[in-house]
Amino acid sequence: MSKIILTGDRPTGRLHVGHYVGSLAERVKLQNSGLYDEIYIMIADAQALTDNAEHPEKVRQNILQVALDYLACGLDPEKSNIFIQSMVPELTELTFYYMNLVTVARVQRNPTVKSEIKQRNFEASIPVGFFCYPISQAADITAFRATHVPVGEDQLPMLEQCKEIVHKFNTVYGETLTEPEIVLSSNKACLRLPGIGGKAKMSKSLGNCIYLSDEEDVVKKKIMSMFTDPNHLRVQDPGRVEGNPVFIYLDAFSRPEHFEEFLPEYQNLDELKAHYQRGGLGDVKVKKFLNNVMQAELGPIRERRKMWEQRTADVFDILKAGTEVAREKAAATLHDVRSSMRINYFEDQDFLNQ
């Protein structure tokens, strides 16, 4: 069986470092591993419209921004098909058929759906499209026969629901769909990066992000304003590293070579943490180190993004070519689905002989 990846993002804004450590860096690593036969990276504009129906221009404008972030991070159009979800109408038809296999109660139990409904204040009035987006996600995954789906930890319930839909379809109509496996980041600190305020997951809508495209001075300003241990009032006070966003970010981004270059008095992050915990290490020094680490990571991404910003016509061609490949793949899956459901009437010679 071919090894196929499907993953993507909603174009509701520029991508941030939470996206990067949560899945983007892993996608680039998987892309360059040579272990996968096909890779599909979806800009999920149709899904973004489920809670932005009155602001389509916001979604439209951010498609290019997300594509630029993808290319800046190292996604290679020679190896990965980057495409626009709404330009593959087969996905909508698959969603419609899968809706018949899922109950309202099951979608309501999905922890990710419950969390996002609350976050968007949709409790009193939930758009049907938004409520059904786990089913749409299952259509996206199965349309490309994805065997592996790199996502953040918060998307685990969505993958479980997708697997249920695959199992139900194959049970009712015969073996047709491919069951996917989830791919989580190998760095556990990357699974859920908090916002700079420390109280919530990094989110564009909450305004607590460090964007991949932020200029160097903006990144520094955000890092120096980050939440730390509120009880670490003086340098000599012992500090907590658990739940401390600065150390969570260091867990996600720092490597041994960063200490050699930027903070040679410490061998590694464990030594830095131990000093902070026993007291005598100030937050400013730790934040300055984090800034150096993140500038080293984000600097090359910024430069590549600026290069692609001068080549937007090429980005357009990349999206168009990737979408054509994606549509061909999805159409083949839809053909198989319709055959299994026996609704391929004009291709079935037995239709008149029942």
Could you tell me what each predicted segment is?
Residues 1-3, 346-347:
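Extreme N-terminus of proteins, especially the signal/transit-peptide cleavage junction
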